[in-house]
Amino acid sequence: MNIFNNHLHETDKEIDEIIKHEKLRQNSVIELIASENFVSPAVLEAQGSILTNKYAEGYSGKRFYNGCEEVDKAENLAIERVKKLFNCKYANVQSHSGSQANQAVYLALLQPGDTILGMSLDSGGHLTHGAAPNMSGKWFNAVSYSVNKETYLIDYDEIERLADLHKPKLLIAGFSAYPRNIDFARFREIADKVGAYFMADIAHIAGLVATGEHQSPIPYTHAVTSTTHKTLRGPRGGLILSNDEEIGKKINSALFPGLQGGPLMHIIAAKAVAFLENLQPEYKSYIKQVISNAKALASSLQERGYDILTGGTDNHIVLVDLCKDGITGKLAANSLDRAGITCNKNAIPFDETSPFITSGIRLGTPACTTRGFKEKDFVLVGHMVADILDGLKNNEDNGKAEQKVLTEVTKLIKLFPFYTR
């Protein structure tokens, strides 16, 4: 078989069918998973290009392989564009994921056994910020801070107390499920007080930071990490930023050869495309719409009597606390899925249920905002979600409500077609 003569549908019908079905699924549902988004055809084209063939260990101009002239140009473009996007002096675009971006910073700045201080998982933190099952919780002495038990907001005085007590080498700000703004300046004050490095993981809010809709951590941190998907609407991958170019040199060495081998040049090219898209004026309008849509979604659920954690949102995340409703997050997410609405079960602060069950759900607006949804559409979505939750409160077999909402979902999404070719 000459592999160059056949297309996917000729070579592997099974994978071709899977991709077709997934395309149909993405077109057919209301996507509320806060960490997901839809990339442009241009990003897809770069990601699926022949750049996937090129091995390029090292950095631009200092590769261990010949023939890297063109991929060097692609990586240089990605770096210059993202530095402009975030107004910073240093960027590394090679990390394969946000988790590996975090690991590279740890490898650059810490030694095994050093103390790190990050947000606990049940308060909205991320696995890589010191959770016990993660390497960050195994290699380091990981201490966690929580949100306030009454307001569910970050308690900066408590973080300062813990920092004074434990003297961390690294203080981490960032989250996977926290709906309010972060005071990076306050974090830096705490870090300086105890002589710690300060890292911000902005994987969820990178788009908000890039457009000025959230305080930038760049002036206050030693290192900033992010994913390149989520609100940045690029390919799945990671990113590291800093204004400290000496720390940048350490991070470069930590990522390669310390942590990774060859970078994924097709992904880096796709990152460059996404960064160019994000430098356009339309992107700022998009992020503003993401936030407005999240506020509309939260308000519509509150009107239906559901508890929204912290009473609302400043970003793209809406956390629904289902404790008083007697519904688990798992039950709610599965029922919503059958009704054509995808989200994820999510722990709420001080949750006593299993992380596989949870007492809440996490909703997000980036993906459907990309499709073109506005506030009025998210008000409708909020009522659809509430209809499913109402049904679960009264009857664990929620088939009737699911079918009704699925019909409404199908009607709404037909107004917002995408990936049509």
UniProtKB/Swiss-Prot annotation:
The modification N6-(pyridoxal phosphate)lysine is found at K230. Pathway: One-carbon metabolism; tetrahydrofolate interconversion; Amino-acid biosynthesis; glycine biosynthesis; glycine from L-serine: step 1/1. (6S)-5,6,7,8-tetrahydrofolate binds at L121, G125, H126, L127, E246, S354, P355, F356. One of its GO terms (molecular function) is pyridoxal phosphate binding. Its cofactor is pyridoxal 5'-phosphate. Its EC number is 2.1.2.1. Homodimer. This is Serine hydroxymethyltransferase. The lineage of its organism: Bacteria, Pseudomonadati, Pseudomonadota, Alphaproteobacteria, Rickettsiales.
